[in-house]
Swiss-Prot record:
It holds the Pfam family FumaraseC_C. This is Fumarate hydratase class II. It comes from the Bacteria. Substrate binds at residues 99-101, 130-133, 140-142, 188, 320, 325-327. One of its GO terms (cellular component) is cytoplasm. The active site is at residues 189, 319. InterPro entries: Fum_hydII, Fumarase/histidase_N, Fumarase_C_C, Fumarate_lyase_CS, Fumarate_lyase_fam, Fumarate_lyase_N, L-Aspartase-like. The gene is fumC. GO terms for biological process: fumarate metabolic process; malate metabolic process; tricarboxylic acid cycle. It catalyses: (S)-malate = fumarate + H2O. GO terms for molecular function: fumarate hydratase activity. It is found in: Cytoplasm. Pathway: Carbohydrate metabolism; tricarboxylic acid cycle; (S)-malate from fumarate: step 1/1.
């Protein structure tokens, strides 16, 4: 059956729009002009724009530039969109105008047409709400779109990423307590080093994550000042007095986050340094997670031909040709996510540096990469915690064998017999394939009782008490 269309008008003239679509002429032009790739504008960003539209309607009504009836029409439409009733009405590609204008107008048009439908008017009639004159009143894409990126980024970090990160930290904390008396061989340069406990080793992972969490939390402070009320370039043209402060208060109330009106709107409309900074903190979290999963797959490598000090949960077969093979797939998935985050950070850095004069025209890319990064990190942290980290168990036999055979235990003798003699003991033990105690006795440097008293792995970890 052939699709039916209605005719809509905008400043460019007439255009056919699918009869059932709630979007209008400008959205339809964007669908035609930017049929690029398959990445759609994230719904999280759409919902943040809708939050702005609702808050703007409330403030515009309060300041006397929008009547109460139209305010309620806007709020009703925004409520429907926020509840997920119209997700399919936001079909635009990320790869569009660098300001995000088409997406802002997509939201304006859908709100207008929801009101038209609810009031028995034809779609596209702009009655009772005009997309520009009423829904977009006191606003410009140039202040709405970056504000929406900031709001969506803050909400996604607070509601999704930080809770997952906290649970991951808590899981490592439980492992630290459980593993704190398991003494093992430390390794530097991938070679044997002095001993530490498995709990101490895990504490490094935990502290890396805590530092990343703290850095992320701190970066949010730069995202709370909003450019709303700056309109086109930061001067506030066509916005009533006090609109900027009032809308920031409304958004702070609805999001329960301390958003405020930016003192200098020119700066955060022409550049997006705060967003670039937050992206860099996501990258640092990825750097930490990459290091942690690399450690885990090194310590678990084997199970018989490698270190094999940790046993990771076995979740699925690992090879189509080698029976019984199981791979550290959660580590690999996390490593790929982290690699992707680092690449997305590079793109956001370049995008952030690409502004010209009063406008940065890479906003959709920044929005997409930030929200994609937060989503990937949140879900990867959850997956690795549930399917791997909670189930990790130490291989005590392997750990003990490696510790007993480590030549670096000799380090504790250095203050007693000196570096050169200690080196000779290690070399002798290695060359003759004997223990350090046997080499010490052979060279005549210490008796067995003194050796046992001084070369004490537990005391070397600082965990005697």
């Amino acid at each position: 059956m052939a699709q039916s269309f209605r005719i809509e008008n905008d400043s460019m003239g007439t255009i056919k729009v699918p009869d059932q679509a709630l979007w209008g002429a400008q959205t339809q032009r964007s669908l035609i002009n930017f049929a690029i790739g398959h990445n759609k504008m994230p719904m999280k960003l759409i919902y943040s724009i809708v939050q702005i539209k609702a808050s703007a309607a409330i403030v515009n009504c309060r300041l006397g530039v929008l009547d109460k009836q139209r305010k309620n029409f806007i709020l009703n439409a925004c409520n429907e969109i926020s509840n997920g009733m119209h997700d399919e009405q936001f079909p635009l590609s990320v790869w569009q105008t660098g300001s995000g204008t088409q997406t802002n107008m997509n939201v304006n048009e859908v709100i207008s047409n929801i009101a038209s439908h609810l009031n028995g008017n034809k779609l596209g009639s702009h009655e009772p709400l005009h997309p520009n004159d009423h829904v977009n009143r006191s606003q410009s894409t140039n202040d709405v779109f970056p504000a929406a990126i900031q709001i969506a980024t803050v909400q996604e970090i607070l509601e999704n990423l930080l809770p997952e990160l906290d649970q991951l930290i808590e899981t490592f904390d439980k492992k630290i307590i459980k593993w704190n008396r398991i003494i093992k061989t430390g390794r530097t340069h991938l070679q044997d080093a002095v001993p530490l406990t498995l709990g101490q080793e895990a504490s490094a992972w935990k502290e890396q994550l805590i530092a990343s969490r703290n850095r992320l939390n701190k970066s949010l402070n730069e995202l709370y000042p909003l450019p709303l009320g700056g309109t086109a370039i930061g001067t506030g043209l066509n916005a009533p007095a006090k609109f900027d402060k009032e809308i920031a208060l409304e958004i702070a109330k609805s999001t329960r986050s301390p958003f405020v009106s930016a003192q200098n709107k020119f700066a955060i409309m022409a550049s997006h340094d705060a967003l670039v900074h937050t992206m860099s903190q996501l990258k640092l979290l990825a750097v930490s997670l990459f290091k942690i999963v690399n450690d885990l797959r090194l310590l678990s490598c084997g199970p018989r031909g490698g270190l094999g000090e940790l046993r990771l949960p076995e979740n699925e077969p690992g090879s189509s040709i080698m029976p019984g093979k199981v791979n550290p797939t959660q580590c690999e998935a996390m490593a790929m996510v982290c690699t992707q985050i680092m690449a997305l950070d590079s793109a956001v850095t370049m995008a952030g540096s690409g502004g010209h004069l009063q406008m940065n025209s890479y906003k959709p890319l920044i929005a997409f990469n930030l929200l994609e990064s937060i989503d990937l990190l949140s879900s990867a942290c959850k997956s690795s915690r549930i399917l791997m980290i909670e189930g990790i168990e130490p291989n005590l036999e392997k750990i003990q064998n490696s510790l007993q055979n480590s030549l670096m235990l000799i380090t504790s003798l250095t203050p007693i017999i000196g570096y050169e003699k200690a080196s000779k003991i290690a070399q002798c033990a290695h060359e003759k394939d004997i223990t350090l105690k046997e080499a010490t006795k052979l060279l005549g440097y210490l008796n067995e009782d003194d050796f046992d008293r001084i070369v004490n792995p537990q005391s070397m970890t600082g965990m005697e008490n």
